[in-house]
Amino acid sequence: MEENKQRVKSMINILQLVAPGTPLREGIDNVLRAQTGGLIVLGYNEQIKSIVDGGFHINCAFSPASLYELAKMDGALILNETGSKILIANAQLVPDSSIDSIETGMRHRTAERVAKQTGSLVVAISQRRNVITLYQGNLRYTLKDIGVILTKANQAIQTLEKYKAVWNDGITNLGILEFEEVVTMSEVVHVLHSVEMVLRIKNEILSYIHELGTEGRLIRLQLTELLADLEAEAALLIKDYHQEKTQDHHQILKKLQDLANTQLLEDSDLVKLLGYPGQTSLEESVTPRGYRITSKISRVPPLIIENLINRFKTLQGVCRATINELDDVEGIGEVRAKKIREGLKRIQEHLYMSRHN
């Protein structure tokens, strides 16, 4: 899984470097439109030096226009790692010919071998096929047309909306069962599955946003709006039901996101994520601590909620507490005690109304 995370991180960094709106992408697009083809290497370390033959050492500031003009020559362009300087123009690259390559064209074969040999980012711009291919180490990625990515991103947003509705239904039903004291592991796992799917689609949309660059601003806004409060509530759900109260619920949610990015999770995986043995029955009754529900009461800060849970242990304990018992909790006076009682009653009524609508 660590290897996959590193791979994803590398791809994000690469896509951000050549995303629409960046000077480098503007220059690459100019070369693509001119149909001259081109080979661009980012980074000039000892390994690159050993395979560069000839060329003009110009060491000038990067500009899209300069890239376009210099790409008219047959050789490769060598840039610094950040793409802010053009170091060498018209360079001949001589990588180790024994390195395997799946490419057929000379330009792309050279690009793949240079990337594998040096680990540097190499951009190959096809002369006839209007395709931009990125290579780094064993990574190979073909940039898609912006229109295609936008279509896929919008489809993913629509799918996310559907799973958000599934989450809303599940979390409403769970809230009602919490007040009725009849929650089983099955209901908790069901809600966590909807969180898993939301996070899986979020990861996919983020990859589109990275590739879209400045063109992905609206998609990012939609994603932010759709996920507003969902992840925070999911973290509190984990805090409510994890076997160990002291576990960092945000870290567990992050672990869920990492797992969602690599595989479809079984019920037993989610049960284990909550600190229980994988063979735990889904019909087993579980009791919420009450962090999620009490956080919905207005003007009750997290420190007071922590004091409440420490005193009454569970949501049921908080609900059954009298005004005097609530008043005894540190930080809660008589006025706030009444607000907590009224707040819990309003939340319960709202949940019942939501279920019948």
Swiss-Prot record:
The keyword DNA repair applies. This is DNA integrity scanning protein DisA. The lineage of its organism: Bacteria, Bacillati, Bacillota, Bacilli, Bacillales. The gene is disA. Its EC number is 2.7.7.85. It catalyses: 2 ATP = 3',3'-c-di-AMP + 2 diphosphate. Belongs to the DisA family. Participates in a DNA-damage check-point that is active prior to asymmetric division when DNA is damaged. DisA forms globular foci that rapidly scan along the chromosomes during sporulation, searching for lesions. When a lesion is present, DisA pauses at the lesion site. This triggers a cellular response that culminates in a temporary block in sporulation initiation. ATP binds at G75, L93, M106, R107, H108, R109, T110. Its cofactor is Mg(2+). It is an enzyme of class 2 (transferase). PANTHER family: DIADENYLATE CYCLASE (PTHR34185), DNA INTEGRITY SCANNING PROTEIN DISA (PTHR34185:SF3). HAMAP family: DisA. Pfam families: DAC, DisA-linker. Residues 8-146 form the DAC domain. InterPro entries: DisA (IPR050338), DisA_sf (IPR038331), DNA_integrity_DisA_N_sf (IPR036888), DNA_integrity_scan_DisA_link (IPR018906), DNA_integrity_scan_DisA_N (IPR003390), DNA_integrity_scanning_protein (IPR023763), RuvA_2-like (IPR010994). Keywords: ATP-binding, DNA damage, DNA repair, DNA-binding, Magnesium, Nucleotide-binding, Nucleotidyltransferase, Transferase. GO terms for biological process: DNA repair. GO terms for molecular function: adenylate cyclase activity; ATP binding; diadenylate cyclase activity; DNA binding. The keyword Magnesium applies.
